[in-house]
């Protein structure tokens, strides 16, 4: 079962019909196909249930999960460089002259084409969770670029996708800094022992703390000197641990064992039933966490 490790949260900026049946047809036109002999990379949709289903969408209680697979050919630059150099030296020796830059560029293309069929592939998968109840889309990605690339494929598949990053009324770093400065956190949240502080001025430095008492005088001095808390490790209701960043992303999600074990009574051999139970559990917990976080951070910006 997928347990999201990261969350990039996006708001649907206008009402849009996202029916799983319609999406299934739209995504199938962009389903994943492996790289051909001359492809550097391929991206497409696969079943979120892996080999247990052919369906490209899976829906439970208004929550839809979909999955993107990306295949990239790995061609280490030293290998390309050596192969190209060998070819240049051989041709220059045969023709008794130095090759022009345009000729070398052309040779590089030839080298790439000759190496591609023998290159190894690297695969990665990115899950998206569409919360049709709360009009949110969550991407399990650690970087904004990967999330945006994934949403770009969804937009291409659906024809349009009016989403914007979830934006809060108050700058997140100011709220996080005040929590640490005042040693007071909203109900349900507890401070852990990791943070990042940045100076307001770009050349003012960055401090990364691990295994640190964040309510200590040492941290207070940095805040008094004008540094802002830009990342903060939090515990939510002893159920989920996370690192909240000033861009609103949630990283290094860790679900408590007591939470993950709630569906242990379901036979693991019954993959579909266990998948549904875990998906319902995960999405309900994360939806509650997101709601609490939005409130704790001062509410969502009104567009």
Swiss-Prot record:
Q: Which GO terms describe its molecular function?
A: double-stranded DNA binding
GO cellular component terms, A-Z: bacterial nucleoid; cytoplasm
Coiled-coil stretches? none
Q: Which InterPro entries match?
A: RdgC
Q: Could you tell me where this protein is found in the cell?
A: Cytoplasm, Nucleoid
Q: Which cysteines are joined by disulfide bonds?
A: none
Q: Name one Pfam family in it.
A: RdgC
Question: Keyword set for this entry?
Answer: Cytoplasm, DNA recombination
Question: Which Gene Ontology BP annotations are present?
Answer: DNA recombination; regulation of DNA recombination
Please name the NCBIfam families in this protein's record. Answer: PRK00321.1-1 (NF001460), PRK00321.1-3 (NF001462), PRK00321.1-5 (NF001464)
Q: What does this protein do?
A: May be involved in recombination.
Q: Which family does it belong to?
A: Belongs to the RdgC family.
Cited PANTHER family:
RECOMBINATION-ASSOCIATED PROTEIN RDGC
Record protein name field? Recombination-associated protein RdgC
User: What lineage is this protein's organism placed in?
Assistant: Bacteria, Pseudomonadati, Pseudomonadota, Gammaproteobacteria, Enterobacterales
Gene name, Swiss-Prot/TrEMBL? rdgC
């Amino acid at each position: 079962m997928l347990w999201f490790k990261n969350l990039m949260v996006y708001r649907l900026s206008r009402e849009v019909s996202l029916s799983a049946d319609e999406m299934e047809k739209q995504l199938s036109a962009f389903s994943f196909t492996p790289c051909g002999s001359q492809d550097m990379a391929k991206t497409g949709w696969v079943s979120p249930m892996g080999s247990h289903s052919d369906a490209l969408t899976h829906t439970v209680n208004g929550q839809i999960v979909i999955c993107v697979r990306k295949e990239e050919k790995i061609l280490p630059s030293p290998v390309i460089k050596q192969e190209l150099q060998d070819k240049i030296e051989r041709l220059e020796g045969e023709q008794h002259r130095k090759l022009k830059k345009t000729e070398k560029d052309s040779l590089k293309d030839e080298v790439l084409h000759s190496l591609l069929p023998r290159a190894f592939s690297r695969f990665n998968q990115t899950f998206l969770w569409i919360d049709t109840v709360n009009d949110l889309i969550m991407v399990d990605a650690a970087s904004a670029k990967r999330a945006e690339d994934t949403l770009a494929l969804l937009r291409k598949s659906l024809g349009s996708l009016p989403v914007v990053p979830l934006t809060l009324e108050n700058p997140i770093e100011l709220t996080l800094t005040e929590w640490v400065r005042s040693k007071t956190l909203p109900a349900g949240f507890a401070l852990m022992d990791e943070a990042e502080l940045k100076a307001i001025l770009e050349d003012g430095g960055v401090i990364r703390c691990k295994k640190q008492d964040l309510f200590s005088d040492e941290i207070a001095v940095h805040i008094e000197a004008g540094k802002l808390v830009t990342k903060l490790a939090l515990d939510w209701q002893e159920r989920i641990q996370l690192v909240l960043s000033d861009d609103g992303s949630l990283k290094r999600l860790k679900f408590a064992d007591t939470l993950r074990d709630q569906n242990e009574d379901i036979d693991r051999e019954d993959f579909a039933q266990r998948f549904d139970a875990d998906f319902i559990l995960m999405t309900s917990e994360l939806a509650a966490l997101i709601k609490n976080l939005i409130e704790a951070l001062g509410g969502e910006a009104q567009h």
